[in-house]
Amino acid sequence: MAETKPTYYITTPIYYPSGKLHIGNSYTTIACDTLARYKRAMGYDVYFLTGTDEHGLKIEEKAEKLNTDPKSYVDGMAKQIKDLWQLLEISNDKFIRTTDDYHERAVQEIFDRLLKNGDIYLGEYEGWYSVDDEEYFTETQLAEVFRDDNGKVIGGKAPSGHEVELVKEQSYFFKMSKYADWLLDYYQSHPDFIEPANRMTEMINNFIKPGLEDLAVSRTSFTWGVPVKSDPKHVVYVWIDALTNYITALGYATGDSEDLFNKFWPADVQMVGKEIVRFHTIYWPIILHALGLPLPKKVFGHGWLLMKDGKMSKSKGNVIYPETLVERYGLDALRYYLVKAMPYGNDGLFTPEDFVARVNYDLANDLGNLLNRTIAMINKYEDGQLPAFKAGVTEFDADLEATAATTIKNFNACMDSLHLSDALAEVWKLVSRTNKYIDETAPWQLAKSDDANDADKLASVMAHLAASLRVIASLISPVMTHAPKEIFTQLGLDPATLAIADLQLADLPAGAQVVAKGTPIFPRVDMDAEVEFLKGKMTKSDKQKGRKAMENAKHEAEVEQGWNPAETNLNLTKPAITIDDFDKVELKVAEVITVQKLKGADKLLQFRLDAGDADHRQILSGIAKWYPEPEELIGKKVIIVGNLKPRKLRGEMSQGMLLSAEHDGQVQLITVPDNMVNGSLIS
């Protein structure tokens, strides 16, 4: 009978597809992916869930603004998020969308069960509602209150800074207040349920002790949601619709098999940002308890990845997107940085200077140079073959061996306790100790000696270096998906043998042939140039720096001798313009999200495009004649005129223009390589 593996179920929050995800959003998914990969390497049967929360008024309004329907809008956004996770090599087992049929069926069933059990009742709600936050607030909870001349409250701002509006409507309520004492008792008997511990203290003091209010769980003021089965004019609100995804994804209440639910629930770790800890540690546990289900073993609320001027915000112009960093520095650099930059439970800080420093110092210098030196010395001193590992041959071996053993032990402890940044710090202690070991043993001196003992020492040093790199590569493999395999390959080891379980320094396969010449796995970058590049990506006012640099280069360049451009016939078809005229035009890279023929206009195609803006934009183009199957354009990267004044065509708004080329009556869209980042400026 086959041995049953222990199970491990880990979830990210499901992401609200109202805009493009930045590196702060991506952290949660990369952190969960790191844990999922680690647990798989340790022999667990892992189920890793992520997805999108696709209902609500905000989505309905976004779609209306873009002249599309909500389903088409979220289809495009879900594809964009899936594409990002693929770029980041996220190893999720399932991607749930709250618009999936099985989820909607389950939500209706769950709502119906709670209603029949008496935990949900019909009432009327009046309060200040923030569309962006999808949350109601009392007047005392508002960060700012607006009053008329008579002192009457007429509006205000939520703690997030988003404006609120007064909403009064019939609503179904969940009896949250009924379970306050039970939840407090549960916290006290399960002190590890919420981590870090200060989050639990915050929940108790700020929300439970002041008194839990019953929770509105349906809406009638919009239609984009799951209808209540017994009362279809109501749609199920986010608290039941979104939170239950963690169990419906496993088959609970779907009417299908619940084998996955029985196998993996309760979740081992549910990782969320600190801003939604309340929903996952108050609303979610109470809903589960009312359904008679066990609670997740742990909810971990991580901090925010901040900029120097606070949270990332498109309005501040301080947002940076993962695609930019992956394209320029590689995926491993981004994954390493995000995991390293976020200390346990606290906020992390992103600065261009720190990011580039980590690429150069941690990756290129410390790890990359260690590999390069080791490969070069094994080729030079051992004919490219890994010597057999022997313990304690030199006076420095024992300390390196002890450091490796401690690193493995501490790394595993950090990973198991969700101290991911500390886990990497432990590995870099071994990286540092191994670099020091080279200086201590001075292999170049041992190689000059005629003493046979020194030859044995030299072989031992080479074996220890290779063995240490093998351990380092194995430990970082949950975080970095490329470098560990490359380290193994350069050492002549099979990347398929990368493993963390039962890892030991001494288990180095002898006789493997290293590569004849090592290749840098993390090339050094120019510090000043890269900091300037990143600042340009983060700051609105710096967007034209690249173009200005190009123009400066043109002015400084000397004309090639022997050729007079003034004599060239330019064959102009339109009046000449100056560079200042051209500089007024904003050309941007955009990705085609959806495209279809415009109803009632056979010549026009209706494009929805991601041009790196906060929202998608719509452009109408008269190229339908040349693209009889326009769906083939979905996913293509095109060039648009981004600052063309919007105009209406056939009753639809067109927010720009697509660039195309025409020859002999044939028209073709101009496309660019897929690896170009959406929103990149064309100069």
Curated annotation (Swiss-Prot):
Entry keyword Phosphoprotein: no
One Gene Ontology term, aspect cellular component: cytoplasm
Keywords in alphabetical order: Aminoacyl-tRNA synthetase, ATP-binding, Cytoplasm, Ligase, Nucleotide-binding, Protein biosynthesis, RNA-binding, tRNA-binding
Renumbered ranges of motif 'HIGH' region: 15-25
Keyword Protein biosynthesis recorded: yes
Cross-referenced CDD domains: Anticodon_Ia_Met, MetRS_core, tRNA_bind_EcMetRS_like
Localization in the cell: Cytoplasm
Sequence motif: 'KMSKS' region, positions: 311-315
Short name of one Pfam family: Anticodon_3
Biological process, per Gene Ontology: methionyl-tRNA aminoacylation
SUPFAM superfamilies, alphabetized: Anticodon-binding domain of a subclass of class I aminoacyl-tRNA synthetases (SSF47323), Nucleic acid-binding proteins (SSF50249), Nucleotidylyl transferase (SSF52374)
Catalytic reaction equation(s): tRNA(Met) + L-methionine + ATP = L-methionyl-tRNA(Met) + AMP + diphosphate
InterPro entries, alphabetized: aa-tRNA-synth_I_CS, Anticodon_Met, Met-tRNA-synth_bsu_C, Met-tRNA_synth, Met-tRNA_synth_2, Methionyl/Leucyl_tRNA_Synth, MetRS_core, NA-bd_OB-fold
Binding positions (ATP): 314
PROSITE patterns according to UniProt: AA_TRNA_LIGASE_I (PS00178), TRBD (PS50886)
Limits of the tRNA-binding domain: 581-683
EC number of the protein: 6.1.1.10
N-terminal signal peptide: none
Top EC class for this record: ligase
GO molecular function, one term: methionine-tRNA ligase activity
Superkingdom of the organism of origin: Bacteria
Subunit structure: Homodimer.
UniProt family annotation: Belongs to the class-I aminoacyl-tRNA synthetase family. MetG type 2B subfamily.
Function: Is required not only for elongation of protein synthesis but also for the initiation of all mRNA translation through initiator tRNA(fMet) aminoacylation.
Protein name: Methionine--tRNA ligase
Source organism: Lactiplantibacillus plantarum (strain ATCC BAA-793 / NCIMB 8826 / WCFS1) (Lactobacillus plantarum)
Organismal lineage: Bacteria, Bacillati, Bacillota, Bacilli, Lactobacillales
